[in-house]
């Protein structure tokens, strides 16, 4: 069974002034299988952010359905949405979203604190994750004391510590330099190889070339998709670049 199923999702906004209707998503349908690493790409205004907000249960579609591990997100009570999100989804953001008044360790623990876990349970979960991500020596430091790449590794640890069914990454390399980007993409690959499902929205061809599948959104619809198959990162990079050129020049779906 798919870990994520998106079926006919449409999102229509009404503008504040004038009451005009804006269709951000027309009819988006796709599925993500357990253990997949999927990238979503598209030009600004294509609907990527709207789609991610709906998948994260931060917004609701005008029509259509989203299922996470068979659970219809529209059937979750408002009072349970935050708990469902915390227990089932891990988030990695462009700007890290770490609290400067908390140590790196406490930032990572935060979802488990909210879930009422004991310190012993939190420590047991953190140790192997911190070792894998190479942040054990940083745990007592504060976000303002570490580099951007180290902050993002802390954010990845926070996403992993709840054992999420799906990690949603929103432009995770956007605020990183080239070296930190390479390191994060290497870590994402390692995490994915352990069976973790990842869905990443990105403008970066380099980041997308590490995924096993790339979906392209244009004018609120899935326009095209590429599968890695046996291709190298370099070969997929070129195919992604060619597809983005086609998108920009108004090419036809293929």
Question: What is each model feature region?
Answer:
Residues 221-245:
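Conserved beta-strand-loop-alpha-helix hinge in the C-terminal portion
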């Amino acid at each position: 069974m798919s870990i994520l199923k998106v079926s006919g999702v449409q999102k229509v906004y009404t503008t504040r002034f004038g009451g005009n209707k804006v269709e951000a998503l027309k009819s988006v349908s796709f599925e993500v299988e357990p253990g997949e690493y999927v990238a979503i790409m598209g030009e600004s205004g294509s609907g990527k952010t709207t789609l991610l907000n709906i998948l994260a249960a931060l917004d609701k579609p005008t029509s259509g359905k989203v299922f996470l591990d068979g659970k219809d997100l529209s059937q979750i009570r408002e009072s349970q949405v935050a708990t469902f999100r915390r227990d089932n989804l891990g988030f990695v953001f462009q700007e890290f979203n770490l609290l400067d008044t908390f140590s790196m360790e406490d930032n990572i623990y935060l979802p488990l604190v909210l879930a009422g876990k004991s310190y012993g349970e939190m420590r047991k979960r953190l140790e192997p994750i911190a070792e894998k991500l190479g942040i054990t020596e940083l745990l007592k430091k504060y976000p303002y004391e570490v580099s951007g790449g180290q902050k993002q590794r802390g954010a990845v640890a926070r996403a992993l510590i709840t054992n999420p069914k799906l990690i949603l990454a929103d432009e995770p390399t956007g605020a990183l330099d080239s070296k930190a980007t390479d390191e994060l993409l290497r870590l994402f690959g390692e995490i994915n190889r352990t069976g973790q499902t990842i869905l990443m929205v990105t403008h970066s061809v380099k980041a997308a070339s590490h995924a096993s599948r790339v979906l392209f959104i244009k004018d609120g619809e899935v326009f095209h998709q590429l599968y890695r198959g046996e291709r190298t990162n370099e070969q997929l990079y070129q195919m992604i670049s060619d597809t983005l050129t086609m998108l920009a020049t108004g090419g036809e779906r293929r």
